[in-house]
Amino acid sequence: MNHILAIDQGTTSSRAMVFDEALTLKSVAQEEFPQIYPRPGWVEHDPSDLWSSVAATARAAVERAEIDGSLAAIGITNQRETVVVWERASGHPIHNAIVWQDRRTADLCHALAEAGHEPLITGRTGLLLDPYFSATKLKWLLDHVEGARARARRGELLFGTVDSYLIWKLTGGRAHVTDATNAARTMLFDIGRGIWDPEICGLLDIPMEMLPEVKDCAAPFGMTRADLFGREIPILGVAGDQQAATCGQACFRPGMMKSTYGTGCFALLNTGEERVTSRARLLTTIAYQLGGKRTYALEGSIFIAGAVVQWLRDGLKIIREAGETQGLALSSDAAQDLVIVPAFTGLGAPWWKPESRGAVFGLTRNSGPAEFARAALESVGYQTRDLLEAMRADWAAGAEGVLRVDGGMAASDWSMQFLADIIGAPVDRPVVRETTALGVAWLAGMQAGLCPGPEEFAADWALERRFEPQMEASVREAKYDRWGRAVRAVMAV
């Protein structure tokens, strides 16, 4: 028994991958599911869609791998912050899952901030008082579903992030657990003491009876139902998607950084045992927890990364598929200084201006599809530098001089070269791009005794290509200064 199933439950699709004990990918299955938008700014998922897509892809991946019953362990990684509440007795959700993107609790967050509660919340959880996180979404459910809070106090209702709900379903209701990285994203978890915070739960009137047990990222989370895979399989690894990618990128030393480019972008800087309080409105979070020991990180999130390419395709209709952007960027007029600030849903870290909206600067009569494509790709590099500048300002120990990248946009050579140019540092792209699934497969495999510990795993990390800065420093700083003026203009409107 020497294979590991990695379940990767994302925002728009569920994926499952089978790895062998050498962490070589053997099979992949993927299934998309519907997004639900009840009102502007509201985003929901039907929990039954999450479960059915996970169950279907897990079975399909195992079947395609042709591993003849040699599945030894399961790891789960997931979209973070999304909230599910379900009945303990039946397992039925009492409402759709409220997704991390959902902004319905913006007024509540504003009221809590006005009442002076943000220092307490940030000091304990490392997070900003924002609808992005789970706590106010959970309060909204308890406030708006009739009888929910009383039922929760009686122990009839359970709360979980997506990982917790999936473990409940996989184990047939035998395990109500989560891991430290997912707990750290709820805005209810004291990341210094490693416990659910009674004061914050009291402030939001959230019954602590409904909260899951918190475990290490590599730990026994429970055994699956025997009918799912022909026998019971242990769930041995769990981490939120960005923390799993941090492990998959082997960013185990303080100072190591990774940046994942999907719809948005998430950059994490390992700060080791030091819990750094950000002055630049970055998030302080748990990178991973192993053997009861927490390793911390600074995290910055960009709302729009790959989504700016989707806008070129679906909004402006100047490309038919994402792969066309690189060719267009290569053919663009370098003399034009078009700047796109893609604040379609506001500005993320380090600005946190949800009310800001996007803009295009430097438009001329000669600006065409090629210039728009280049400016769109450049915007991702500029935003990444914003995050890295904030991280350097926050942590005196400083980041190492190399950024490891993954995600869909990392496949673009042009984008990665510009990223190296604009941050003025090498950008490393790994051989294995599926770093999120790889990270949680490693966690589960390590707990199962199949995979090595962090040091040996890091030694096996393989570089596919390093992008070295080629842009002259004067050009780099002039371009970044132009970007800064554009962002300030957007925030001033």
Curated annotation (Swiss-Prot):
It catalyses: glycerol + ATP = sn-glycerol 3-phosphate + ADP + H(+). Its EC number is 2.7.1.30. Pathway: Polyol metabolism; glycerol degradation via glycerol kinase pathway; sn-glycerol 3-phosphate from glycerol: step 1/1. Key enzyme in the regulation of glycerol uptake and metabolism. Catalyzes the phosphorylation of glycerol to yield sn-glycerol 3-phosphate. ATP binds at residues 11-13, 263, 306, 310, 408. One of its GO terms (biological process) is glycerol metabolic process. The gene is glpK. Glycerol binds at residues 80-81, 132, 241-242. This is Glycerol kinase. One of its GO terms (molecular function) is glycerol kinase activity. ADP binds at residues 11, 15, 263, 306, 408. Sn-glycerol 3-phosphate binds at residues 11, 80-81, 132, 241. Keywords: ATP-binding, Glycerol metabolism, Kinase, Nucleotide-binding, Transferase. The lineage of its organism: Bacteria, Pseudomonadati, Pseudomonadota, Alphaproteobacteria, Rhodobacterales. It comes from the Bacteria. It comes from Cereibacter sphaeroides (strain ATCC 17029 / ATH 2.4.9). Disulfide bonds: none annotated. Gene3D superfamilies: 3.30.420.40.
